[in-house]
Amino acid sequence: MKAASKSGVKLCLKLLALAVKVDRDPSLGFLAYLTTFTNDRESEIRKNVDLIQTFKMANPVIGVVHLLPLPSSARWQGDFQAVIARAEQEATALASGGAHGLIVENFFDAPFPKSQVDPAVVSAMSIIVQRLKHLVTIPIGINVLRNDARSALAIATCTRVSFIRVNVLTGVMATDQGVIEGKAHELMRYRRELGSDVKVLADVLVKHASPLGSPNLTTAVEDTIHRGLADGIILSGWATGRPPNLEELELARAAAGDTPVFVGSGANWDNVGELMRHADGAIVSSSLKRKGKIEEPIDPVRVRQFVTALAQGVANRDSAASGNGAVSYPTVAV
C-alpha cells in the first residue's frame, strides 16, 4: 500500500475513534476534539510532506557509504579507482536492500581536520557522488567530516543531490579535532547565495564530542531548528554504533515539533522498533555491514532485514496510536 493510502486509512481510523468517544459522552464537544485533532494532523502532514518530498516515504532508512581513505588523508592508499569501486558496491547494496536514501561520508579519512578539508577531498567526493547518481535512484546526501558543511553544501548543490548532514550546526563542541563552533549563519547565507534547495540535517549534541557549558537537550534542539534553520535533526549515542538514550530521544521528539527527527547511530534490527517510537527515520551503517563490523562492506541482506524491522516498528507505533485506547483528546466543551 502506498504511503498516501496508509495515511488516509489512519486518518479514517482516528476520526472513527473520535466519533465513538463523542457518542459515548455527548457532553464532550466534538468540535473541540476535532480542532485539537486537526492541529495535530496538520503538524504530522507538514513533517511527512517534507520527508516524502525528499525520500518518497515518511519514515526513511538512510544508509551510509563510508568512503575508503581519500587523496590527501593520512591513510590514502593511492588507488582512487578502488575507492570508487567500493562506493559503487555499497550504494548498490543499499539500493537493492531497500534503503530509501544514502549519505556519502569520508569516514575513513580519520584523523579529520576540524573544519575545512583539502580541495582534493572535495574533488574526490564530487566525482564519487556524480558516479553514484547515475548508478542508483535513491536520494543521496553528503557529510564532509569533521564539520566542513560549506564544502558539503557546495558538492551537493553542484551535483544536484538532496541533502547534507552537519555534525555541528549550532553551539560549541569539544571534540578529538579540537573545539568546533557551529556556523549556521555562514552555511545558511551560503545556501541562499547558491540558490540551493539542499536540505540540512543537523546533529544535536553530536557523537564523539562534549558540549562546552551545561548541555540542555531541549534548548539545543530548539536552537538548532529555530536559530540554526535545520530542516531535520539527528540524535546519536555517544559514539559510532551506540544508540541514543530513549528518554533523550523522546525529549528531542517533543522539542522538535514539526521538524523530522532521525536516529543517527546505533540502530539495528533488534532496537529500531523501540527507537522509532520517537523518531521519523534512521541513519545507519555499522549494523548493515557484514558481521556488523565497521571495516566490512555493506551486505544487502542485512539492509533488507533492517528495512523490514523499521517498517514493522513504525506499523506497531502507528497501530498503538490509531485508537486502541492510546490516543487521548482534551475534554473541552464548545
What do these predicted ranges mean?
Residues 157-230:
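Conserved anion-binding
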Residues 52-79, 193-209:
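N-terminal small/glycine-rich loop or linker at the start of catalytic domains
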Residues 115-141, 184-200, 244-263, 303-313:
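Alpha-helix-loop-beta-strand connector modules within alpha/beta enzyme cores
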Residues 162-177, 234-239, 265, 279-299:
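Glycine-rich phosphate-binding active-site loops on the catalytic face of alpha/beta enzymes
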Residues 101-124, 171-175, 234-243, 292:
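Glycine-rich, proline-tolerant flexible connector loops at the mouths of alpha/beta enzymes
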Residues 61-65, 104, 140-144, 166, ...:
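Hydrophobic faces of well-ordered beta-strands that scaffold small-molecule active sites
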Residues 147-159, 267-281:
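Catalytic cores of alpha/beta
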Residues 179-183, 290-318:
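C-terminal helical cap(s) of enzyme catalytic domains, especially alpha/beta-barrels
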